[in-house]
């Protein structure tokens, strides 16, 4: 299961930028790296006992990539680790190059040509799935498949990134049991044209009996956590608590 460095929306800085990770077998997989994330990584000592770093990002809004360059340079110059950046779109790599990051500092894995990533040390497959957030950017959710080489996977997680809905194919796979857990961008704000999914809409989409497999993240200020729990949803928890 995923652990979280932060669970807040762009302006809900009290909860930090939403960023998830898996740390096993001396390997760190980080999903998104917003403005506040690098500092939090250091305070949690997440790079201790790590010799392999994988980074995947869902899109290029600042609360998802704001400290990405600092993390890559720190890994390379201080930890002597060359991280692997799994990019769902070529623009993501171009953005790093504008920051002065080259293939000397970071291995670029351009998933636009092959959307399937296998991290052998974690026995984990990543699959980027285009979703719907804002018209200005290409944005992605990520399927995480444990034991991808086996016919019977240990589990399949869908991580929504930022999204104003749940794509039909993802929802169908979740309801049918093909996806075991869903981490979903959810907000209090509820209006036409919202770039995020409201709690009201989430409750309309997810049957009551399946809500225990949903973890709410990327919450905005004033989000009603008690109501979400009463509706049967889980809340993604920040590792080490709120700072």
Residue ranges and their predicted role:
Residues 1-44, 110-169, 240-243:
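Core dinuclear metal-dependent hydrolase active-site scaffold
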Residues 20-21, 46-49, 71-75, 175-177, ...:
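Glycine-rich, phosphate-binding/catalytic loops in enzymes
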Residues 30-34, 51-63, 86-88, 157-163, ...:
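Active-site neighborhood of phospho(di)ester-bond hydrolases with catalytic His/Asp-centered motifs
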Residues 50-55, 105-111, 184-185, 234-239:
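Short hydrophobic/aromatic-enriched beta-strand-loop microsegments
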Residues 90-92, 115, 219-223:
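Short, polar loop motifs at secondary-structure junctions
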Residues 164-243:
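Cap/insert and terminal regions of metallo-dependent hydrolase folds
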């Amino acid at each position: 299961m995923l652990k979280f460095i932060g669970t807040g929306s762009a302006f809900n800085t009290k909860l930090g930028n939403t960023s998830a990770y898996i740390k096993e077998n001396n390997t760190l997989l980080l999903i998104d790296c917003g403005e506040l994330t690098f500092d939090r990584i250091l305070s949690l000592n997440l790079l201790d006992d790590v010799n392999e770093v994988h980074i995947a990002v869902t899109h290029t809004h600042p609360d998802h990539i704001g400290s990405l360059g600092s993390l890559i340079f720190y890994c390379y110059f201080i930890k002597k680790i060359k991280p692997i950046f799994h990019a769902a779109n070529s623009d993501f790599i171009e953005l790093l190059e504008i920051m002065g990051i080259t293939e000397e500092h970071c291995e670029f894995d351009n998933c636009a040509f092959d959307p399937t990533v296998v991290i052998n040390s974690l026995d984990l497959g990543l699959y980027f799935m285009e979703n719907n957030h804002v018209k200005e950017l290409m944005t992605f959710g990520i399927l995480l498949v444990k034991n991808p080489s086996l016919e019977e996977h240990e589990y399949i997680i869908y991580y929504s990134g930022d999204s104003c809905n749940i794509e039909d194919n993802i929802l169908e796979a979740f309801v049918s049991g093909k996806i075991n857990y869903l981490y979903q961008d959810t907000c209090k704000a509820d209006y036409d044209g919202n770039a995020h999914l409201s709690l009201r809409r989430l409750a309309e989409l997810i049957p009551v009996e399946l809500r225990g497999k949903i973890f709410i993240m990327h919450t905005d200020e004033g989000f009603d956590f008690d109501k979400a729990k009463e509706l049967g949803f889980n809340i993604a928890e920040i590792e080490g608590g709120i700072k």
